[in-house]
Amino acid sequence: MPKYCRAPNCSNTAGRLGADNRPVSFYKFPLKDGPRLQAWLQHMGCEHWVPSCHQHLCSEHFTPSCFQWRWGVRYLRPDAVPSIFSRGPPAKSQRRTRSTQKPVSPPPPLQKNTPLPQSPAIPVSGPVRLVVLGPTSGSPKTVATMLLTPLAPAPTPERSQPEVPAQQAQTGLGPVLGALQRRVRRLQRCQERHQAQLQALERLAQQLHGESLLARARRGLQRLTTAQTLGPEESQTFTIICGGPDIAMVLAQDPAPATVDAKPELLDTRIPSA
């Protein structure tokens, strides 16, 4: 927390320079020395005020005899009592009040030949009566009356302001429209490539399906030809198990008749039909 002076009408803080062009130093109140503390408070004009251990007085309120120097450092003597206090308001507040008050400049003196400021033309419907008052040598006031015809209003230029934003909007939309068109063309090309790839895959699938059917037909023909070339002597026996778990029927292609293997208790009831 920065140090500051607690004396009335004093606003010195740490880092400022004093009257001797040296940094202002701060000293705590002698809270443990009652008589000396009362002397400090009497010189400050705050006899009924009780300072705390965190409040200080700056070196500007002590005379040079209240200090002692050791190795270039300024120390406060044990019996030093502050005696320099300002009873008026601080100069800073005076400067602040002066700066807040705006100087009132006197009005410039009127000149005889000073032209009147021109006011904006106000359209009127009829003649205007103008009264001019001015000091003269003969009488205190001279009244001059004249009739003025109203001026025709100046032609206002055609409003072309709304066209400018429209042109700016068109010029701003041109690049955006071109970018969107390029993007659409790019997407169309990608779609065409995907369609070509899909058609190629469909043709390949049809070709593979046809080849698989042709190979299956060839295998069937080969089996048929091999079966025709083999004689009855070279026929093989095929075993087919059908029915329930108690019936097993064996079929053979050789001249031997088919045999039926079954359990003894089921021979008379379960006979497979030819």
Swiss-Prot record:
The record's Pfam families line, in alphabetical order, gives: THAP
In Swiss-Prot or TrEMBL terms, this protein is called THAP domain-containing protein 8
Q: Which domain of life is it from?
A: Eukaryota
InterPro entries reported in the protein's UniProt record: THAP_domain_protein, THAP_Znf
Q: Mind listing the UniProt keywords for this protein, alphabetically?
A: DNA-binding, Metal-binding, Zinc, Zinc-finger
The scientific name of the source species is Homo sapiens
Q: Where are the zinc fingers (THAP-type)?
A: 1-85
Instruction: Spell out the PANTHER family in the cross-references.
Output: AGAP005574-PA, THAP DOMAIN-CONTAINING PROTEIN 8
Can you provide one Gene Ontology molecular function annotated for this UniProt record? DNA binding
Region Disordered: start-end pairs: 83-121
- The encoding gene is THAP8
Lineage, broadest ranks:
Eukaryota, Metazoa, Chordata, Craniata, Vertebrata
Xref: SMART domains: DM3, THAP
Task: Identify the SUPFAM superfamilies for this entry.
Answer: Glucocorticoid receptor-like (DNA-binding domain)
Where does this protein have coiled-coil stretches? none
